[in-house]
């Protein structure tokens, strides 16, 4: 393939990724052995990987995909010939360039509503673009940074990207995310929960007041979605609450129910709900909480339809308001 490739035309390679190719250590997926083998072959052949992107090629009604997060796409790898005189670089240079280039790419992907289940694979493109433009990436001891290690670093940067997004979230929601990441909706001791809450500059009492958690007999747990109150204007005190209410609406009422909530938002930007869904998908996926990951993935996949329906709902409400004013 390399021999017949032209310098001025990119090469595209289609790869059907399997969920079972993950190499798991503990609760987190470290790197895909399938990706490692594929990328190693491409880079060793002399190509530079310039992008990866998912394509909708798999049937969502397959038995393996029913109510799961089975990848709904194949991956397209875009490659070009690497310069014969490509230099080497240090791990430090690789990390600096990765952080500078990966985060804007992730923002563009989120804006395009790429499914969370596909985001980790799509993020490999801009990450490997940095790695593969060099002949070698060298560790401090002079050894070569392996593709496996590069993939792990890219995954770590993906986690860091989502973690940084929490900085703009209200304190109560940040506590909920911290509790969820460790305990989901299960109980923990009041003492442990209190330490987490105080670290985020709030309290368990505040979470109870906002109807985000229950605290009884020395135990605390996040309220599961069926336990949460219905959406009201007060819900907007917490991004966590609104996001969970939208997820619950999608499960019970579909896109229309979600659109009713989204069209009513005044203080919370709708895209903040989508961004938190990405983060919660990532947490649930790392923990192996399949059903939890599924609901957040479903929300992002449906987001364009939700926004369209929400816009229609807002227009209808404005027209009705104008008619009432005219009649008065």
Set out the residue ranges of the language-model regions:
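Short, flexible loop/turn elements at secondary-structure junctions
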Residues: 15-19, 51-57, 81-83
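Short, contiguous acidic/charged loop-to-helix segments that flank catalytic cores in large enzymes
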Residues: 18-33, 65-70, 111-114, 233-234, ...
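C-terminal accessory/interaction regions of large nucleic acid-associated machines
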Residues: 107-328
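Class I S-adenosyl-L-methionine-dependent methyltransferase catalytic core
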Residues: 26-33, 37, 44, 54-72, ...
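Flexible, glycine-/basic-rich loop-and-beta segments that form/coincide
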Residues: 62-114
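Conserved Class I SAM-dependent methyltransferase catalytic core
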Residues: 1-50
